[in-house]
């Protein structure tokens, strides 16, 4: 009850030391569609569930796995409109870096800058925190990277992680399956199997999205490729 009086104030700490609006933003993430990221020896895979709103909905009109640069991509769990704002901001930050330094932005630099934007929205008046967590993958300096950034602006590097609905089950599954020598092909299968742990209904190429990042860059798998991977694990 003591927290309730602070729940509408973004910039005021509650007596227990919480910013309650951030707690609510994290709840929005935990209720969002599951997403998985796995760093392999030779690349990174991102996978997510794409909920179909209606049989009349064109499921390929909006993507959840998005490229930021040729070598960086991301996915989210949480609120789609907030995600699109951050995708636009991330692309702009990457372009600004390139204009100044004449080289692609390193993955860790982009993560730091996007997380700073998210953190700014936890201490400014007239705004609210972003209701999304991001998984950001990239390839630079000859190696893969995987980061997670939360509504608070906190970010961490991961070997493999899951977020969104039933993320605890996803992380438990990954802890059992992950090893340091995992190849990208195996990581794709593992990512899809992790999603399957909490998937409701039939998994098809229309209701999941997969992105991969390796030495060749970042790309979203085509529906045909996803269908082939689903057939391989069936």
Swiss-Prot record:
Name of one Pfam family that matches: Proteasome
InterPro entries in UniProt: Ntn_hydrolases_N, Proteasome_alpha, Proteasome_alpha-type, Proteasome_asu_N, Proteasome_sua/b
UniProt modified residues of type N6-acetyllysine: 70, 171
Coiled coil region boundaries: none
Residues bearing PTM N-acetylalanine: 2
The organism's place on the tree of life at top rank: Eukaryota
Record PTM text: Phosphorylated on tyrosine residues; which may be important for nuclear import.
Subcellular location: Cytoplasm; Nucleus
Residues recorded with modification Phosphotyrosine: 6, 24, 76, 121
One cellular-component annotation, GO: proteasome core complex, alpha-subunit complex
Family: Belongs to the peptidase T1A family.
Function: Component of the 20S core proteasome complex involved in the proteolytic degradation of most intracellular proteins. This complex plays numerous essential roles within the cell by associating with different regulatory particles. Associated with two 19S regulatory particles, forms the 26S proteasome and thus participates in the ATP-dependent degradation of ubiquitinated proteins.
Protein name stated in the entry: Proteasome subunit alpha type-2
Protein's organism: Rattus norvegicus (Rat)
């Amino acid at each position: 009850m003591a927290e309730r009086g602070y729940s509408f104030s973004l910039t005021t700490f509650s007596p227990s030391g919480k910013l309650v609006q951030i707690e609510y933003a994290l709840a929005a993430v935990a209720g969002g569609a599951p997403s998985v990221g796995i760093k392999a020896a030779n690349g990174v895979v991102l996978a997510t569930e794409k909920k179909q709103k209606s049989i009349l909905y064109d499921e390929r009109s909006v993507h959840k796995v998005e490229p930021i640069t040729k070598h960086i991509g991301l996915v989210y769990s949480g609120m789609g409109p907030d995600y699109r704002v951050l995708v636009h901001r991330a692309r702009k930050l990457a372009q600004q870096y390139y204009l100044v330094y004449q080289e692609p932005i390193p993955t860790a630099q982009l993560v730091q800058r996007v997380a700073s934007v998210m953190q700014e929205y936890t201490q400014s008046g007239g705004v609210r925190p972003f209701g999304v967590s991001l998984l950001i993958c990239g390839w630079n300096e000859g190696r893969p990277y995987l980061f997670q950034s939360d509504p608070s602006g906190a970010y961490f590097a991961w070997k493999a992680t899951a977020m969104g609905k039933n993320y605890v089950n996803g992380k438990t599954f990954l802890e059992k399956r992950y090893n340091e020598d995992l190849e990208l092909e195996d990581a794709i299968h593992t990512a899809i199997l992790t999603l399957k742990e909490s998937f409701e209904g039939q998994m098809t190429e229309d209701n999941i999205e997969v992105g991969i990042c390796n030495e060749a860059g970042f790309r979203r798998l085509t529906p045909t490729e996803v269908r082939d991977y689903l057939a391989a694990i069936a």
